[in-house]
Amino acid sequence: MTPLLELKDIRRSYPAGDEQVEVLKGISLDIYAGEMVAIVGASRSGKSTLMNILGCLDKATSGTYRVAGQDVATLDADALAQLRREHFGFIFQRYHLLSHLTAEQNVEVPAVYAGLERKQRLLRAQELLQRLGLEDRTEYYPAQLSGGQQQRVSIARALMNGGQVILADEPTGALDSHSGEEVMAILHQLRDRGHTVIIVTHDPQVAAQAERVIEIRDGEIVHNPPAVEKVNATGGTEPVVNTASGWRQFVSGFNEALTMAWRALAANKMRTLLTMLGLSLIHI
């Protein structure tokens, strides 16, 4: 089998005063399409840094990371953003939903930045929310949703551009046991549909539901069992195809981003006013 994600001798260090603190110390790891993997470790073990590198949110100090055979170090900023946008979906413990957008609008956000036309975005967002049992909550704002419902919205958002690889950082950490079980059931369904699911957790009960549990300690992998071979793993759903021309894609994306920015300002009128006053005082 050829790995979907391949890390070779990955190291990551950060400056701390006059010294360099090494957080990851020579990580080598292969993850295959269709796997459900848990990465476990104590706080400050390096598991979150590893997740950020896997999701192309951070770059290694040294070593090689390949996604579907592509060395990410050879990509410029735009190409890296495209790779991240088209291949990865992120699920966070605290959901990270935009409070001024409805559930449907939150799900649409990744496709806005991908330049997908509004009609296509709307149809796909509605389809995903319906699949996750939220067809009657599309116009609700995050504050009107339970924690479990907010996490389902974030899962739909992660799938908006295809989500070949789902990276879930403590996905049940902020949920009660019933909602946590529902979220894990959804992640299992995604794995069954061919998605590659990577869960970062400190909860042994959550980790036990994965096919492979990788343990990291002090920046090093201390346990990494062999992968379970998959038959006909497809690597997730097909990415959404954008039929718009390059210029139309740019205009559509710019207009939608501007609209979202305006909504954010309108939703935080007092903060916006204070910011404007602060800027005015600076120039007096």
Predicted regions mapped to residue ranges:
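Short, function-defining helix-loop hinge/capping sites that tune catalysis or transport
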Residues: 113, 211, 276-277
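N-terminal Sec/SRP start-transfer signal
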Residues: 242-279
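ABC family nucleotide-binding domain
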Residues: 3-207
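ABC-family P-loop ATPase nucleotide-binding domain
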Residues: 1-13, 222-256
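Conserved catalytic segment of ABC-fold P-loop ATPases
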Residues: 209-215
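Conserved small/polar residues in nucleotide/adenosyl-binding loops
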Residues: 283-284
